[in-house]
Amino acid sequence: MLLHIPDILSADQVADFRRRLDAADWTDGRETVGHLGAQAKHNQQLPEASPLRRELGEIILVALARHPLFFSAALPLKYLPPRFNRYSGGGTYGFHVDGAVMNLANGEQLRSDISCTLFLSAPDEYEGGELIISDTYGEHEVKLPAGDLIVYPSSSLHQVRPVTAGARVASFFWVQSMVRDDVQRRLLWEMDGSIERLRQTGGDAEAVLQLTGVYHNLLRRWSEV
């Protein structure tokens, strides 16, 4: 499921992030990937051990926890903590698929079900830099307002087109969902949204209760926790 989630961060939060990130020390993004990835990846990244990365990442995780649409769509179980990258001067990342299993700092492993990009630059701040996500329906071009999030299956082939002017700053991270199957997650998300709309429009209370029970029974059947 490819989903645009607006306003994860407020305009004030984005401005604070940018002020601090613009003054940060960035490293070559190729240092964070293997040989094959390094051939396609040309960007800068905030070092993994950076206190700023950890601090800003925590702010993002708190914002996600408060966002009902994100929770409904992702059904998050674990996160690989947010990281930060910057593309400028022709920086790009060719077509690739994210790794299936990632190591967490506590020694646990995370299965990458959902890939997330949180845009921190406004579209008019840079040229190029579109996130291209390829799936069975074709290629989808993504370039969102600062503070907005795109989520998509980690199994998707994707790339970042060259940034030919300005700088594209973003946060990116991965989620292991309680429901690993993307089709099942989408069905649950659609059902949850329908139930909420029925509640808001004064739908039949008994029918809403029954549908809510169906939702939770499906989640119980499909979830891995």
Curated annotation (Swiss-Prot):
Record key words, sorted: Dioxygenase, Iron, Metal-binding, Oxidoreductase, Vitamin C
Tell me which Gene3D superfamilies the record gives: q2cbj1_9rhob like domain, Rabenosyn, Rab binding domain
- Broadest EC class? oxidoreductase
Recorded hits in InterPro entries, A to Z, give: Oxoglu/Fe-dep_dioxygenase_dom, PKHD_C, PKHD_hydroxylase, Pro_4_hyd_alph, Pro_4_hyd_alph_FE2OG_OXY
Please list the residues that bind 2-oxoglutarate.
168
PROSITE patterns assigned: FE2OG_OXY
Q: Which residues bind Fe cation?
A: 96, 98, 158
UniProt KW Ion transport keyword: no
Q: Which cysteines are joined by disulfide bonds?
A: none
The UniProt record lists the EC number as 1.14.11.-
Entry's Gene Ontology molecular function annotations? 2-oxoglutarate-dependent dioxygenase activity; iron ion binding; L-ascorbic acid binding
Q: Which cofactor does it need?
A: Fe(2+); L-ascorbate
Q: Name one GO biological process term.
A: intracellular iron ion homeostasis
Q: How is the cofactor bound?
A: Binds 1 Fe(2+) ion per subunit.
Q: Where is the Fe2OG dioxygenase domain?
A: 78-177
Report what the protein is called.
Answer: PKHD-type hydroxylase Smal_0990
